[in-house]
A protein has these predicted regions:
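Non-heme Fe(II)/2-oxoglutarate
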Residues: 6-62, 73-84, 91-207
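A short coil-to-beta-strand element that immediately follows conserved catalytic motifs
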Residues: 206-216
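Catalytic core of non-heme Fe(II) oxygenases with the double-stranded beta-helix
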Residues: 220-284, 295-299, 306
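Short proline/glycine-enriched turn/loop segments at secondary-structure junctions
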Residues: 287-293
Length: 307
């Protein structure tokens, strides 16, 4: 990538980046370059141990992005127009080459841009980074559906069932954030394929839902544990998040799931134990707010397919 900071993308990324970049000029190309650099920085962060401390101070990827953005002159209107033109080209190429691995890699790279642009879950204030942010949020909202619906308390999860699920997570809660991704035991696996859950998801989102046979426990066990903004893997249409345990902070509101919209707005969704959210997460850039002092949380993440 000429005329951009010296970053070395893996070959699989370079193939599609260079082909798409060749179709862009002027501000559209500059914006695409900024997103690719942001994606490279985002994918380099420690995904398995995300805590606010890992991206603070000198490790904040926005420092490098701001140096690049300082070279980007033009009015807000000009950059908004460039964003719209760039989006049309990128969406056309990603859709046309949907089954090709280099373009799947490009989609991952651009999704990772949201991490570097808002590593603290706060929408950028710098004008250039804000345009880039809105662009990447709009990209995934146009590629896929991006609805999010609270399912409320799941009526079939009584206190006994909730206690069984919490017992399954005991080892993971002891290990902490590193244990995130742990496969559930029998109770969690049963919930992940429960027909009642599929019906609730389908009714909430207006689709026919079937089990994805993929579920993971997520643990937030330290102050500052969180998950930065990202869209999910496109393999699954829906991600259901079931709260199993939430020790709230002594003061202030608890951590919420954040849903970002292309206009720069942010929606907050809090979960109580036993309640769930249905998220069309491959089209929705979303994040988990950092745990506040004394706050702890355990979530079961369930992948669901749309049929």
């Amino acid at each position: 990538m000429d005329d951009t900071p010296d970053i070395k993308l893996p070959y699989l990324f370079r193939v599609s980046v260079e082909k798409v970049r060749a179709k862009l000029t002027g501000r559209e190309r500059a914006l695409f370059d900024l997103l690719c650099v942001a994606g490279h920085l985002g994918r380099s962060l420690p995904n398995s141990n995300s805590n606010r401390r890992t991206v603070s101070g000198a490790r904040d990827p926005r420092k490098q992005l701001l140096r690049l953005a300082a070279r980007m002159d033009g009015t807000t209107e000009e950059w908004d127009a460039a964003s719209a033109r760039m989006l049309n080209v990128v969406i056309r190429e990603l859709t046309r080459h949907d089954k090709e691995e280099p373009y799947r890699a490009l989609r991952v790279l651009l999704g990772n841009a949201s991490i570097a642009l808002a590593p603290d879950c706060v929408v950028p204030r710098d004008a250039s980074l804000l345009v880039a942010w809105k662009t990447v949020v709009a990209l995934f909202a146009r590629l896929y559906r991006s609805t999010i619906k609270p399912l409320g308390r799941l009526s079939w999860i009584d206190e006994q069932q909730l206690a069984m699920l919490k017992r399954e997570t005991a080892r993971g809660r002891t290990r902490g954030r590193h244990a995130s991704g742990m496969r559930p035991g029998r109770a969690g696996r049963t919930l992940a394929v429960d027909p009642r859950l599929m019906r609730a998801v389908g009714k909430a989102l207006g689709l026919s839902a079937s089990p994805g046979y993929q579920a993971r426990y997520i643990f937030y066990t330290r102050d500052g544990d969180y998950f930065w903004p990202h869209p999910d893997d496109p393999e699954y249409a829906v991600n259901v998040l079931v709260c199993l345990d939430h020790r709230r902070p002594a003061r202030g509101p608890g951590s919420a799931l954040l849903a970002y919209r292309p206009d720069g707005s942010v929606e907050r969704y809090e979960l109580a134990p036993g309640s769930a959210l249905a998220v069309e997460a491959r089209g929705l850039v979303h994040a988990r707010e950092p745990m506040r002092r004394g706050e702890r949380m355990t979530v079961l993440s369930i992948n669901v397919k749309a049929v």
